[in-house]
Amino acid sequence: MKVLSRGPVADAVPLLSILTACDCSVEELERIAAFLETQTLKRWRWIHCPGVDSDCLPVEGMAVLYLPRAPAALRATALEEAIWFLLSRPTLPWVELREDARRGDLFVSRRSLPEGRIGARLNGRRQPCSSAGLPNAPRKRLLLLAPWLEPGGADRCNLDMLRALAREGWMLTVVASLAAEHRWRDRFTALTADVWVLPDFLAAEKACAFLAYLVDSRQPDLMLLSNSAFAYDVLGYVRTRYPGLPVVDLNHMEEGWDDGGHPGRAARCTALLDRHWVVSGHLRHWLLDRGVEASKVEVLHWFADVDSWKPDSLTRAKVRARLGIAPQCVVIAYAGRLCAQKRPELFAASLGELARRGSDFVALVLGDGELAGELRNDLRRHGLAGRVRMLGWQDEAELRELFQASDIFFLPSAGEGIALVLYEAMACGMAIVAADVGGHAELVSAHCGFLVPRRDAEREARDYAARLESLMREPEMLRRMGQNSARRIREAFTLSLFERRLRGLLERVPVSTPCGVCTDSPVPALGAARLSMQWASYRLANGLRCRLDIQKHGRFSRFLERCAKGVFFLRTFGAKALWQKIRKH
């Protein structure tokens, strides 16, 4: 038997023991070693022996990994995930790791060791010691708690901030708490290997324990909460256990649920937070009106990368030729997730009114979502099928080219912080017609476009159509507003200015612990229960969609999700509570 000790402390009890067969070649052993060095787990012992029943194995609390060969495709967090998969399920003797880092279901439970495959076993139920994991490093580390890794404005903000911090030398740890497709996982793992999607490997009741393990092993210098209900649920636990850890939240817009959505939770939990970062002055005033101290709320306006997002006449001509759009035709762009917040029905009604006024235009819908089917029906009802092209989600390069080929950006949202897509649309030289909501007036000046106040839908449609028509009838004003938009971004909302503002915010985060009374601090068990319900209902709805071959985004798909949530709510809280919830809403 050959025993090799790895890690900073050779005589420490290893968190994981690696078992390899005695017939492994030297080349295979080298490949296994190379794989292990890529893992986020750094404390392990390697045992090169002929069998799995060695006298050295039955050690209380030891996790054992059978590794007959080097895996080809396991993500960098696989070993730590395997340990916590087992810790979450103490009665499970074995687990098999699938060799596909792209799959969410990385683990399959086994009752016996899979012959010739990768497997792990946990002897005893001791939790990993706090010193295990990544070694201490002189670089600063951020721990980000987010709900998911999905296309959208909040996740774009998270990515932008992580990139900026990575350029400053920060190390990054990202935790996503909800069950979802996590279509942007690759974008986050491109910045850091330390990305954790909790429902992929963890039992919900262990979520708090795992968060404590991450804090103990990673030793972050700052915890950032970004639109995460779970983060607010466990905030009291975090502040009690780690009083010296600075905690900041990042919020974008007030919402109509739970007395303001996440900003409402932030206001009620302000005693437990060191700082509140918001993306608009509008949201800052909203928080101040709810009793948050002015000194704790700081505005971080976003940006567009003007080296990439800029007017380009050659691209404009190329894209229009590809789409069969005449050079002089006015092109209206509408981009984002097709959901109730973006009001696609008002987009269709406004363009229908514009068409009835005799205006000639082409509109591009750049996005997808649960209301895509309804939007198609609305476009047909308004006679716009030939004028509006639904192009679906675009990658960044394609979206930029389509923006450069467009003249007007139209966004009739029900609510926003400051829509990120406005920064990029303006940088590409588009005039803006958008809803006067949130902090839009902080970005879109009267020289760059029109902001339309909220009214009843029919009147708003006429107002939007009138603004769009005025731009189309006055080409010189349209051109001038587009130029002003691009100039405003170059002068006040660039990446370098954003990074300078972010550095200033980080320098002002206090080291001292906040004190006071939190008016909304649920116990961690409630946060775990909410996670468990969301994970279970998502999996049930997803399974039904697959069995019934139902599209992910659509009316019936949303009905299935509501039914699944109702089933688990009924099972957890009973019929009376469900009826009260239905009556309330």
Residue ranges and their predicted role:
Residues 1-14, 98-141, 148, 513-585:
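Non-catalytic membrane-proximal stalk/linker segments that position and tether the catalytic domains
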Residues 139-146, 326-342, 348-351:
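Conserved donor-binding/catalytic core segment of Leloir-type glycosyltransferases
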Residues 282, 303:
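Carbohydrate-associated surface elements
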Residues 321, 470, 477-492, 504:
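A short, well-ordered alpha-helix in the C-terminal region of glycosyltransferases
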Residues 393-394, 401-406:
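Short alpha-helical donor nucleotide-sugar binding micro-motif in glycosyltransferases
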Residues 414:
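Aromatic "clamp/platform" in nucleotide-sugar-dependent glycosyltransferases that forms part
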Residues 431-434, 444:
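Short hydrophobic beta-strand element within catalytic cores of glycosyltransferases
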